[in-house]
């Protein structure tokens, strides 16, 4: 009996919400014009093997996974840290495997 009351209350709530005037007063034309005028806020991503020390979360995506900013100290005595966008090996192998599977069945 309790389940029936809960379901009935849920249905009444959904019906009253859907029949109300709506929360948003924007018309479809206004919404489309706002979407057309909105500029992209995403900054440009850093390509693979380029320096990402300025922003370690800016690496581009490959076909499936996002590259990772990897930092290391190069050989040669310079103690300056170098950071580049790279694809981890396990993700590289996963992409190759999925590409081969897609080529077999697709």
UniProtKB/Swiss-Prot annotation:
InterPro entries per UniProt: Spider_toxin_CSTX_knottin (IPR019553), Spider_toxin_CSTX_Knottin_CS (IPR011142)
Expression sites (tissue/organ): Expressed by the venom gland.
Principal subcellular localization: secreted
S-S bonds: 45-60, 52-69, 59-85, 71-83
Propeptide residue interval(s): 21-41
UniProt GO cellular component terms: extracellular region
Coiled-coil region: none
GO molecular function: toxin activity
Keywords: Disulfide bond, Knottin, Secreted, Signal, Toxin
Any Pfam family the entry gives: Toxin_35
Domain of life assignment: Eukaryota
Position of the signal peptide: 1-20
Domain notes: The presence of a 'disulfide through disulfide knot' structurally defines this protein as a knottin.
Similarity comment text for this entry: Belongs to the neurotoxin 19 (CSTX) family. 02 (D7) subfamily.
Protein name: Toxin-like structure LSTX-D6
Origin species: Lycosa singoriensis
């Amino acid at each position: 009996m309790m389940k029936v009351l809960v379901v009935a209350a849920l249905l009444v709530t959904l019906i009253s919400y859907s029949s109300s005037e709506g929360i948003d007063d924007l018309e479809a034309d206004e919404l489309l014009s706002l979407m057309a005028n909105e500029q992209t806020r995403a900054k440009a991503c850093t390509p693979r093997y380029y320096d990402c020390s300025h922003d370690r979360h800016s690496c581009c995506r490959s076909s499936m996974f996002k590259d990772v900013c990897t930092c290391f100290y190069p050989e040669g005595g310079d103690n300056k840290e170098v950071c580049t966008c790279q694809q981890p090996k396990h993700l590289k192998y996963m992409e190759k495997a999925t590409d081969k599977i897609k080529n077999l069945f697709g």
